[in-house]
Amino acid sequence: MCIRDSRGVFVRNIPIDEAIEIFELRATMEELVGRRLAQNITATQQQEMENLVRNMERAVAATDSHAYHLLNLQFHDRLVEMAGNRKLASIYRKLVKEISLFRRLNLAGHNVLPVSAHAHWEILEAIKSGNPDTAGRVLFDHAMNSKARTIENDEQRRRAELPNDPT
C-alpha cells in the first residue's frame, strides 16, 4: 500500500519480475524459519499449527478460498513469529504484503486448495522431525512452488491477453 499526498491510498502494482525476486527472498527466509523451528518448536506451538491446518482443511471442504487464503497467511506468519527473530518477521511481513495478490491468485486454480492443505501438513511433519535440514528444505521448496505457480499464472494471463490471430 502506498500513500501519496493529495492522492490518497492505493495498492502498488508489483511487476512480475519484482514479485519473483520477492518469492525467492521469501523462500530463503522460510528455509531459515524451518531450520530454527525444527530445533525449538514447543508442543503448544505444534498444537496451534495443527489446529490452523485443520481449519485450512475445513475451508477446503467448504470451498471457501477466501478463508483458506487468510488461514494460509496466518500459518506462515505464525511460523515466522515462532522462529523468534523479530527483524526477520518484520522484513518477511513487509515482503509478503507486496505479493499478497499473487499469493491469492495462486490459490485460485482447480484442485489447488487440497494440495496446498496437504503441503502444510508436510511442513509441520518436517518441523516436528527435529531435522533442521529437512524442515528448511520443505519450507524452501514450498515457497519456490508458489513462485513457480506465480510464473505459470502470469504466462497464462499473458497468453489470454494476446489478440486472436484469424489467419
Task: Indicate where each model-derived feature is located.
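Short linear motifs at protein or domain termini
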Residues: M1-Q39, T44-Q45, I151-T167
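A generic structural signal for short
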Residues: D64, N111-V112
